[in-house]
């Protein structure tokens, strides 16, 4: 009996569990994908039960097994255009709540450090986008007014500068967390807040920290390769 109990406990520690509730999700299908450096690998799906769901990713899953104990990125899809991304390590149990209308803008997560930090980044970006959209609406209504347009452009650049400062502070405050990669690559309207060429030293420092914490992570190896490619350019 003791051996059975220990085996069961060991299995729980090496699995990732993601549970939660999606408001107004009904009985829709929810898909789960592992985000790899080669793209998305769908590993499970379930029908919501009055919005509730549960995924248990076993350590026996080949994609999970080969990733040792480094954080893994997962993406939950209600549809191709409505999803949220999160991170988890083996042994973690994430609890997620969200509204079906927009998973990324409304979700809250607990149970994992990387997951919580990713949510903070998503929430900060949502605030930025909301403010940027307000400025754009005013801009559109005053296309012919050069003075107002110039003022809006100044306010927008202050907004961009402020969010970039937030990301810089985030990276400095969490140097050993994989969520720093998410912060570095955060973007709005196809514009990154960090430029790969001008801010390469930031990515190099993240890589240096991550290499110590998770030397075998495919994400880390890919980021190191990206730096090498940029530095090898003539």
Q: PLM features: residue spans?
A:
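Extracytoplasmic electrostatic interaction patches
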Residues: 86-91, 186-194, 203-210
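Hydrophobic core/packing positions within alpha-helical solenoid repeats
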Residues: 156, 184-187, 227
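Structural signature of alpha-solenoid helical repeat scaffolds
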Residues: 171, 175, 195-198, 215
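Amphipathic alpha-helical repeat scaffolds of TPR domains
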Residues: 175-190
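Helix-turn-helix repeat elements of alpha-solenoid scaffolds
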Residues: 157-164, 196-204
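N-proximal helix/coil linker or "cap" segments that precede and/or mark the start of modular domains
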Residues: 202-234
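Sec-dependent bacterial lipoprotein signal peptides
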Residues: 1-7
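A non-transmembrane, solvent-exposed segment enriched in polar/low-complexity residues
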Residues: 9-158, 162-165
């Amino acid at each position: 009996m003791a051996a059975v109990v220990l085996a069961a406990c060991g299995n729980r520690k090496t699995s990732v569990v993601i549970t939660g509730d999606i408001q107004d999700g009904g009985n829709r299908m929810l898909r789960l994908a592992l985000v790899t450096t080669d793209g998305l690998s769908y590993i499970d799906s379930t029908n919501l039960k009055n919005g509730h769901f549960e995924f248990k990713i076993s350590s026996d899953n080949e994609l999970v097994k080969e990733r040792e104990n480094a954080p893994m990125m997962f993406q939950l899809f209600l549809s191709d255009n409505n999803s949220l991304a999160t991170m988890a390590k083996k042994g973690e149990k994430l609890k997620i709540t969200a509204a079906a209308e927009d998973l990324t803008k409304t979700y809250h997560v607990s149970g994992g450090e990387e997951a919580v930090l990713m949510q903070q980044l998503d929430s900060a970006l949502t605030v930025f986008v909301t403010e940027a959209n307000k400025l754009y609406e005013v801009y559109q209504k005053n296309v012919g007014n050069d003075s107002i347009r110039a003022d809006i452009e100044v306010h927008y650049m202050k907004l961009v500068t402020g969010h970039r400062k937030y990301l810089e502070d985030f990276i400095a405050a969490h140097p050993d967390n994989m969520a720093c990669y998410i912060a570095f690559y955060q973007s709005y309207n196809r514009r990154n807040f960090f430029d790969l060429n001008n801010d390469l030293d930031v990515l190099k420092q993240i890589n240096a920290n991550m290499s110590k914490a998770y030397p075998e992570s495919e994400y880390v190896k890919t980021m190191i390769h990206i730096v090498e490619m940029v530095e090898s350019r003539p």
